[in-house]
Amino acid sequence: MAVSFQTKNPLRPITNIPRSYGPTRVRVTCSVTTTNPQLNHENLVVEKRLVNPPLSKNNDPTLQSTWTHRLWVAAGSTTIFASFAKSIIGGFGSHLWLQPALACYAGYVFADLGSGVYHWAIDNYGGASTPIVGAQLEASQGHHKYPWTITKRQFANNSYTIARAITFIVLPLNLAINNPLFHSFVSTFAFCILLSQQFHAWAHGTKSKLPPLVMALQDMGLLVSRKDHPGHHQAPYNSNYCVVSGAWNKVLDESNLFKALEMALFFQFGVRPNSWNEPNSDWTEETETNFFTKI
């Protein structure tokens, strides 16, 4: 049995196929609807973050003392006390009083001279790259631009480098020498040198912030005064180097001793002191108000 399938309309050939195959462009339109979620204030969590406070004259860590600073000051003070004890014990044993007293006075006088020579040297020679003492040279020379910072430094921060040097110098002397006159001189000299940076800081202080005793000693000429020392911070920055009593400043400045030493070093080694250079922004004083305004 044969079955035949017939359609009403017979099949026709497809003749409407496009001959070119160009790209088809389709335009799609998207719409986005946003909704504002309702905040649940009860579930909000505030995360606490530690934020560094802005730098100020009261929290600058470079002006604060560390335990290392304090230990060096304690070590230096101990060696000075040991030297002074030897002078007292020796004085009792030998029944000498006038000579040790004169030796103490000589130590005080020469401490002022020593502070001036040292201050002149570190102000004029070397810099941050100088081995061993580079950091101290940089701080001393930078003091001309920011002189007021010395009044913000804590005592041990301001004095530990001197105390460290005193420890290494005076300790061997204590062990090797017992002469009471020698120790009268050494203990007084070292004591004044140890405190010289504090005397220096007081010379930059305002009258309202200084203890009455300090002001009295300054007025008597026993400590470097607030009136005389500021001349050191005026161009050409080549005077008033002594910072214990300041008694040697007039002698050294009028005799031109430091200028003669500078000439000798220049002709011998070809090294120019900083005081010969034209004043620039590195040495021009910037006031405390202007400095903290920039921070």
Curated annotation (Swiss-Prot):
It is a multi-pass membrane protein. It is found in: Plastid, Chloroplast membrane. The chain crosses the membrane at residues 72-92, 102-122, 175-195. It holds the Pfam family Lipid_desat. It is an enzyme of class 1 (oxidoreductase). Its EC number is 1.14.19.-. Keywords: Chloroplast, Fatty acid metabolism, Lipid metabolism, Membrane, Oxidoreductase, Plastid, Transit peptide, Transmembrane, Transmembrane helix. Fatty acid desaturase involved in the production of chloroplast-specific phosphatidylglycerol molecular species. Catalyzes the formation of a trans double bond introduced close to the carboxyl group of palmitic acid, which is specifically esterified to the sn-2 glyceryl carbon of phosphatidylglycerol. Belongs to the fatty acid desaturase CarF family. This is Fatty acid desaturase 4-like 1, chloroplastic. It comes from Arabidopsis thaliana. The gene is FAD4L1.
